Amino acid sequence: MSLIDPRAIIDPTVILADNVEVGPWSIIGAGVEIGEGTVVGPHVVLKGPTRIGKHNRIYQFSSVGEDTPDLKYKGEETRLVIGDHNVIREGVTIHRGTVQDRAETTLGDHNLIMAYAHIGHDSVIGNHVILVNNTALAGHVHVDDWAILSGFTLVHQFCHIGAHSFSGMGTAIGKDVPAFVTVFGNPAEARSMNFEGMRRRGFSEEAIHALRRAYKTVYRQGLTIAQAAADLAEPAAQFPEVAVFLQSIQTSTRGIIR
């Protein structure tokens, strides 16, 4: 049984699973579907088409599933898909997609989106991602699993943030961030790798040392990307972690931060 505050406004087409809670003065529009155990706090606005999974918590003053302000958007039906076990804190804004891309913005599972963060249209957020307060993602941004973007990080449209990467506070990202790399500054510069995060997540010391050597190959030896990639082929075959790092470099479309 769901617990709906009588002061909430819910469109009759909304689909609510069991044990959903909706707080006072929240507005849930047509085309929204909410999974079991999700809690929608007070003063939240949800607009469809939006599908929200199980056991999420959305805090007050968040706007989730609103139309994109992208000038290409002409009212086409687009959607937002949110997975399970996400925490969306106060004042977060998440926009639906555009038909010029996938027509879908996606947020995976077990993510923490902190206060006043923004996720732009057509962005794809993986799992276990943390967006700290006031981080803003432009449209078409991809953020891979376990990335952490510190407060006031700004990400240009179409950038790709690699798995396990980390940005310092106030970083302005205009190119792709390879997996595991830490970036700081405006404009962003690569400083090291997220070794502390790797240890917390149980990476072996052998894998960490291999990634350290791979980082030096790309960032400290004055090689071109093609030359560095050739040098990393052998360690990538030995260590899956190095293969992930190498793939994030080779598949970059905007060029990597160096």
Swiss-Prot record:
The keyword Magnesium does not apply. The keyword Phosphoprotein does not apply. Its main location: cytoplasm. It comes from the Bacteria. It is an enzyme of class 2 (transferase). One of its GO terms (molecular function) is acyl-[acyl-carrier-protein]-UDP-N-acetylglucosamine O-acyltransferase activity. Its EC number is 2.3.1.129. GO terms for cellular component: cytoplasm; membrane. Pfam families: Acetyltransf_11 (PF13720), Hexapep (PF00132). It is found in: Cytoplasm. One of its GO terms (biological process) is lipid A biosynthetic process. Pathway: Glycolipid biosynthesis; lipid IV(A) biosynthesis; lipid IV(A) from (3R)-3-hydroxytetradecanoyl-[acyl-carrier-protein] and UDP-N-acetyl-alpha-D-glucosamine: step 1/6. Signal peptide: none annotated. It catalyses: a (3R)-hydroxyacyl-[ACP] + UDP-N-acetyl-alpha-D-glucosamine = a UDP-3-O-[(3R)-3-hydroxyacyl]-N-acetyl-alpha-D-glucosamine + holo-[ACP]. Keywords: Acyltransferase, Cytoplasm, Lipid A biosynthesis, Lipid biosynthesis, Lipid metabolism, Repeat, Transferase. InterPro entries: Acetyltransf_C (IPR029098), Acetyltransf_C_sf (IPR037157), Hexapep (IPR001451), Hexapep_transf_CS (IPR018357), Lipid_A_LpxA (IPR010137), Trimer_LpxA-like_sf (IPR011004). PANTHER family: ACYL-[ACYL-CARRIER-PROTEIN]--UDP-N-ACETYLGLUCOSAMINE O-ACYLTRANSFERASE, ACYL-[ACYL-CARRIER-PROTEIN]--UDP-N-ACETYLGLUCOSAMINE O-ACYLTRANSFERASE, MITOCHONDRIAL-RELATED. Involved in the biosynthesis of lipid A, a phosphorylated glycolipid that anchors the lipopolysaccharide to the outer membrane of the cell. Homotrimer. Belongs to the transferase hexapeptide repeat family. LpxA subfamily. This is Acyl-[acyl-carrier-protein]--UDP-N-acetylglucosamine O-acyltransferase. It comes from Pseudomonas savastanoi pv. phaseolicola (strain 1448A / Race 6) (Pseudomonas syringae pv. phaseolicola (strain 1448A / Race 6)).
